[in-house]
Amino acid sequence: MSKVIGITGGIATGKSTVSELLTAYGFKIVDADIASREAVKKGSKGLEQVKEIFGEEAIDENGEMNRQYVGEIVFNHPDLREALNEIVHPIVREIMEQEKNNYLEHGYHVIMDIPLLYENELQDTVDEVWVVYTSESIQIDRLMERNNLSLEDAKARVYSQISIDKKSRMANHVIDNLGDKLELKQNLQKLLEEEGYIQSESE
């Protein structure tokens, strides 16, 4: 029977890498970040609603959402962040639901890649939650390198979410990503074997 698994973690813990690895085992991925971009793509109803709230500056010269402009506003104004979420979240849910149901109808196991799964209280929309775990210090280092952020900015982003330790305690399974990609792959393979998704190579 097909299962719906929520993959989450903290910022820069390696969720995308885990999703990428899972596709090789036949899982289908429904990505919240991709759905979020789809919700406000050029010419969409969602983008038109964003423009109504944030003004013409919210649209760049290519007719797409000016993410930097909108991002800076919502980071400093919680009320406008809430207004943006009220536009985007229902559209994202609809996109993800359609994608998920399509995969389930064809008998696939589905991975719902949702960075803010616990923050948005979506744990009851999936059969299980798997958290990709790494330490906060590694999160901060990766974020500084990947996004070219200062130490203070990286810490602010990490601490704006529920801590990775708390998420791990709430999860059905924790995938350790304290090492390199090979170790991550081995840890993931072990979980898939234990849960019966794949056969052990030693069998």
Swiss-Prot record:
Signal peptide: none
Subcellular location: Cytoplasm
GO BP terms, alphabetized: coenzyme A biosynthetic process
Any matching Pfam family: CoaE
GO cellular component: cytoplasm
Residues annotated for ATP binding in this entry: 12-17
One GO molecular-function entry: ATP binding
Catalytic activity from the UniProt record: 3'-dephospho-CoA + ATP = ADP + CoA + H(+)
Domain DPCK: from-to ranges: 4-203
Pathway entry: Cofactor biosynthesis; coenzyme A biosynthesis; CoA from (R)-pantothenate: step 5/5
Top-rank taxon, per record: Bacteria
Enzyme Commission number(s) of this protein: 2.7.1.24
Keyword annotations: ATP-binding, Coenzyme A biosynthesis, Cytoplasm, Kinase, Nucleotide-binding, Transferase
InterPro entries: Depp_CoAkinase (IPR001977), P-loop_NTPase (IPR027417)
Described function: Catalyzes the phosphorylation of the 3'-hydroxyl group of dephosphocoenzyme A to form coenzyme A.
HAMAP family xref list: Dephospho_CoA_kinase (MF_00376)
Family stated for the protein in its record: Belongs to the CoaE family.
Protein name (database record): Dephospho-CoA kinase
Upper classification of the organism: Bacteria, Bacillati, Bacillota, Bacilli, Bacillales
Gene: coaE
